């Protein structure tokens, strides 16, 4: 008996605060779905206060290329890092315009369990801007507190490898524990175990919109 719930979106948006957030939270899923659906990846800040982070935007583009996302589908905004709470209205208007232009059927963004001020602001404004749209939350290990995935999506070994390769493009962060490939793989294995699958990407459900379809 098939116990999987199938879901699909013709247009799927991934929205993160900073370069690397989307890949950490959903890189394997992106690799899995990008051949089959239109994916848009939006990072709201290219403005990194730390001068040691001057290369992260270029690393982000290379990372997305590894995942198979076309360059024209990778958007990087200009909001100032660590100042998102002070730009809520501007972020909301930016996201509303994004919704009008792209009209995603599913949106992935930061989990509500994320305690980074920029990440939390993005989540709140995504929920306001994309009313009537399914929204799922991804985990960024370094800044989450109490995240537990209740929506698990099976991915393959190939997807896992692509996620690891994508994160390896961030030479800026190669010594950071949250970029350790063993931790990344272990997280995918753990989420897979929760789903009784070899690997899974894990999310929490911020909003689910659906129609129950009966098979004939």
Locate each region found by the language model:
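Active-site environment of divalent metal-dependent phosphoester hydrolases
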Residues: 22, 48-50, 82, 114-119, ...
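Histidine-centered beta-alpha loop that forms part of the nucleotide-sugar donor binding/catalytic region
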Residues: 111-112, 139-141
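Short Gly/Thr/Asp-enriched flexible loops that form oxyanion-binding sites at enzyme active sites
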Residues: 117-129
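Short beta-strand segments
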Residues: 41-43, 108, 137
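The feature marks non-catalytic terminal segments
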Residues: 1-5, 71, 106, 134, ...
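Residue-level signal for the nucleotide or nucleotide-sugar donor/cofactor binding architecture
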Residues: 17, 117, 158
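Active-site rim/loop-helix segments in enzyme catalytic domains that contact anionic ligands
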Residues: 1-103, 128-132, 187, 205-208, ...
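Proline-aspartate-enriched helix->loop->beta-strand connector
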Residues: 93-114, 119
């Amino acid at each position: 008996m098939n116990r999987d719930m199938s879901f699909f979106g013709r247009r799927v948006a991934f929205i993160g605060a900073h370069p690397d957030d989307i890949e950490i939270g959903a890189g394997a899923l992106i690799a899995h779905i990008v051949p089959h659906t239109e994916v848009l990846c939006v990072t709201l800040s290219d403005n990194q206060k730390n001068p040691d982070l001057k290369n992260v935007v270029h690393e982000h583009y290379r990372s997305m290329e590894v995942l198979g996302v076309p360059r024209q589908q990778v958007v990087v905004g200009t909001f100032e890092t660590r100042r998102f709470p002070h730009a809520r209205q501007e972020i909301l208007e930016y996201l509303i315009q994004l919704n009008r232009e792209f009209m995603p059927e599913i949106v992935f963004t930061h989990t509500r369990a994320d305690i980074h001020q920029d990440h939390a602001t993005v989540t709140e404004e995504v929920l306001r801007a994309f009313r009537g749209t399914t929204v799922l939350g991804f985990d960024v290990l370094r800044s989450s507190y109490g995240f537990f995935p209740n929506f698990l999506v099976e991915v393959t070994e190939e997807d896992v490898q692509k996620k690891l390769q994508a994160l390896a493009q961030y030479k800026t962060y190669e010594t950071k524990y949250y970029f350790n490939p063993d931790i990344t793989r272990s997280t995918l294995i753990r989420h897979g175990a929760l789903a009784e699958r070899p690997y899974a990407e894990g999310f929490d459900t911020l909003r689910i919109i659906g129609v129950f379809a009966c098979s004939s």
